[in-house]
């Protein structure tokens, strides 16, 4: 599976950049609803995914390449059939199950959402940016942050990926910035799965922010 299916939207803004400094961020257990439009001018918001885990992978242009690769890896990890799916179906693949999950209960999905942060694009040129995004990403929705929402709400480290995890109740679980090594990637994936497990009706507990090296 080529990374381009996730990569193209963010590659529009990407340039090679040095490794970003690692940032540590601790968030409150607050409910959030991040809303913006995608390249098709469709309104998108995290609130509609209540009951699932949302992973927002965002970056400015210097961090776009690393962000796209991280997002692609996360999506394929939780949706393995995406590896061989056609481009038109890549983002619609079923989520991997959880051991011991009741057959009668819906398994929480994991929505890995690419966000292109472009506050520097002036309003008259935003139409051009949307058009280019539609051409390069006709199937995968890319949220376009022209207003600096992500940086204002969660902070952002330039030159690398930034990740926000939102739990099944719509609460900010964790925020991390900077390049992840293999162990950190596994810790992030484990934290997402733990949120999914905790949402099971018979064992539901408050989702606690994971201690992840950032």
Say what each PLM segment does:
Residues 148-149, 158-214:
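Thiol-/selenol-based redox modules, centered on thioredoxin-like
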Residues 7-18:
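Bacterial N-terminal signal peptides
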Residues 1-4:
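N-terminal secretory signal peptides that target proteins for export/translocation
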Residues 70-112:
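Conserved helix-turn-beta segment immediately C-terminal to the redox Cys motif
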Residues 19-25:
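Sec/Tat signal peptide C-region and signal peptidase I cleavage site
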Residues 48-71:
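Short active-site neighborhood of thiol/selenol oxidoreductases, capturing the structured segment around
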Residues 31, 93, 100-158:
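Short, internal strand/loop/helix patches
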Residues 34-53:
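A short beta-strand-turn-helix
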